[in-house]
């Protein structure tokens, strides 16, 4: 998935669910006005021993939620140990036909590069500059030709409080200091 598509998908979710917290508990029921409520659920991110199970590698087969078609919902997935016993069961989210759109695994995303400069003491400007590109012919993992600088990403880790946003609705964090249930609710 390209960054541009991921960004559009995220903002569609935010508008439809009226929340920045995509991992809020899933609720299939509409509110009294007919609007979506809740979020897509924690998905597989709440598995307590994911690292011990397989070192954080993906383990949900692609297409597990296909029964939902282009809909939105969750489908249970039993995580099976080598001996055949069930380790736990996770809920796999699907949003408008896209399986695990947010928060499943670290993902490679074309159309965005971050240039991380050394700190000022080390001869740089100390910034992490976000560059984006919407032309697949110009996608690059290391270059910036055809990319536009859209803002500076937060250098510190923490929960996202503000995103770059700008003219393109960028979703990369510019400020941390939020929480797991406040602001954007995602850890950077």
Where are these regions (language model features)?
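Functional-site microenvironments in short loops/helix caps that host divalent-cation chemistry
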Residues: 1-152
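Acidic, glycine-rich loop-and-strand cores that form catalytic or ligand-binding grooves
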Residues: 133-187
């Amino acid at each position: 998935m390209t960054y541009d598509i991921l960004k559009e998908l995220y903002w569609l979710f935010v508008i439809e669910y009226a929340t920045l917290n995509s991992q809020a508990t899933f609720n299939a029921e509409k509110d009294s006005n007919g609007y979506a409520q809740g979020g897509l659920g924690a998905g597989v991110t709440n598995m307590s021993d994911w690292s011990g199970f397989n070192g954080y590698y993906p383990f949900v087969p692609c297409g597990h939620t296909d029964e939902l078609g282009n809909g939105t919902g969750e489908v249970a997935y039993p995580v099976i140990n080598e001996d055949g016993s069930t380790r736990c069961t996770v809920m796999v989210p699907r949003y408008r036909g896209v399986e695990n759109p947010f928060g499943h695994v670290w993902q490679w995303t074309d159309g965005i590069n971050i240039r991380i400069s050394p700190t000022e003491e080390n001869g740089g400007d100390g910034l992490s500059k976000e560059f984006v590109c919407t032309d697949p012919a110009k996608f690059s993992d290391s270059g910036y030709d055809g990319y536009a600088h859209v803002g500076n990403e937060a250098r510190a880790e923490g929960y996202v409080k503000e995103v770059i946003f700008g003219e393109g609705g960028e979703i990369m964090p510019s400020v941390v200091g939020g929480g797991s249930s406040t602001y954007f609710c995602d850890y950077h």
